[in-house]
């Protein structure tokens, strides 16, 4: 015979009543999709009008997901993956196309832009703290025409909020968190929009400080006394301990940064924006543990750290030529990364490799872009990019 179970009755009731509830909630209201304006093709247009694969996250989206870095919002973009081993150490991957992420001199297959400033670099891309960000645009597939040789697999664009004319505004934010397995953490930021000359000049200042508490312990242990790999072992190899390096929560990190943008509206058709920013990342060990040592524990024999400091400067000119819109961007990017990792527990003798201290001084010089859009049908880009990269790699 037929018998109605409590679960079946509950499901049937929910399915029957759901349309009625929906009709009551939406009665008298219009339902539509939110229009997102992007500039991925170097002109302002709706994301729905672009015949390409692009995902955009607005500032409201980023706030809702509490995004602080690349790895926080990458999971919401289907074609994007971020490989990260710690703060300030990330590799952006589109559609699974990637080079050796462990090589510091490997050329990236995906480019990262902060406004009109290219952050693409050999090895790992620098971390961008998500403070005062207008939106994030992710372009999947080759983008070399507009974003250079690094954009073979895709391009990530991080767009900051620009200075606003005739509006004095200050925004502060602070949050703290704690857990049973590690140190406490906090995020603090301040944003100041300052009008200098009515309808002509405005300044926007951003400052932030963040601490991510460590949660991995380096516990006491000895070096292995057997040679599983067949390499030569120094005398007394099995008698060394790590008493001098024992530390709790040793993978913590701190981030300090600032950004300043000065916008000058020359007239209705021409404007310039000068942007300067700096960020310093001081982090401990990698976010990795050894399950043989215990949960969230490792046995290391020397301190581990990563220091990542960079400064950026950008000058952008935008104007109407009558027959086309012109965007000229000149930028400079200086970055120094120092990394110290312990390899004591490895039985093989390591030859010199691209490790230790990594210093890079990449400079990006002007590119120009013009687009004609008279009838809305004919549109052509004229694009020129002239990058110069100088890098010094020191091994130890």
Place the predicted regions along the sequence by residue:
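Extracytoplasmic beta-strand/coil segments of soluble accessory domains associated
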Residues: 39, 71, 75-117
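N-terminal Sec signal peptide and the immediately downstream disordered periplasmic leader
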Residues: 1-65, 71-76, 268, 272
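Short acidic/polar hinge/loop motifs at secondary-structure boundaries
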Residues: 102-103, 109-110, 115-142, 190, ...
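Non-catalytic regulatory/gating segments with a bias toward low-complexity or hydrophobic composition
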Residues: 54, 62, 74, 136-141, ...
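Outer-membrane beta-barrel domain signature, strongest for Gram-negative TonB-dependent receptors
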Residues: 239-396
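Transmembrane beta-barrel wall of Gram-negative outer-membrane proteins
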Residues: 171, 180-283, 311
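N-terminal periplasmic accessory domains that precede
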Residues: 70, 91-93, 113, 126, ...
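Outer-envelope beta-barrel architecture signal
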Residues: 46, 90, 108-110, 166-170, ...
